[in-house]
Amino acid sequence: MQLDKGLFVAFEGPDACGKSTVSKLVYQKLINFFNNKDSVILTREPGGTEVGEKIREILVNYDIDPRTEALLFAASRTEHVWNVILKAKANKKIILCDRFIHSSLVYQGIVKNLGYKNVYKVNQFGISKIKPDIVFYFSANPKVLLERKTKDKDRDIFDRLDNQYAQEENLKKIIGGYSSILQFDNRNVIRLDALKPVEELANKICATILERVR
């Protein structure tokens, strides 16, 4: 089935909100719907390209200055946008991206006190005004997120960043940061209750995506 147009979708939220699990299920559901795995791309940030994955390894394995961290995230994102996302969208594909610029604005800009405007400027140099057509934000109570984090042993780069701020008050800072950033431009933001069943969330997201591409 040929799509009428491409669509760039980002999944955002604090660690343990369930967005990665849901995005993978959405990917499988869309592939089954179109009966064509080439119609949908599941990708992530940092990463998504060979260069991006190398940068991800650095971010995971080294403790670095927040400014360096912000620049590395921006570099990975620049490669990702120009070599994967825009090309896929031009070819009328659906791009499902686990995190995008919002994560940098929150984690480096607000949590690490670099200033979200400074982080935004760095990213704009690399990606211009490219932004997702839809941002699904997974909202959850800090206490619930902490409970999930203690149960899940499979940690990654943003999980490491979160672990530096694992106390409930600092999780509130992360969630508050998302609220501030998403208010900055909320025209394409859809808020989801992360406590809803995974299947229910995936079905809602798929329905929204299909409305946009047909």
Swiss-Prot record:
One of its GO terms (biological process) is dUDP biosynthetic process. PANTHER family: THYMIDYLATE KINASE, UMP-CMP KINASE 2, MITOCHONDRIAL. GO terms for cellular component: cytosol. It catalyses: dTMP + ATP = dTDP + ADP. SUPFAM superfamilies: P-loop containing nucleoside triphosphate hydrolases (SSF52540). Its EC number is 2.7.4.9. This is Thymidylate kinase. It is an enzyme of class 2 (transferase). Keywords: ATP-binding, Kinase, Nucleotide biosynthesis, Nucleotide-binding, Transferase. Pfam families: Thymidylate_kin. Belongs to the thymidylate kinase family. Phosphorylation of dTMP to form dTDP in both de novo and salvage pathways of dTTP synthesis. GO terms for molecular function: ATP binding; dTMP kinase activity. ATP binds at G13, P14, D15, A16, C17, G18, K19, S20.
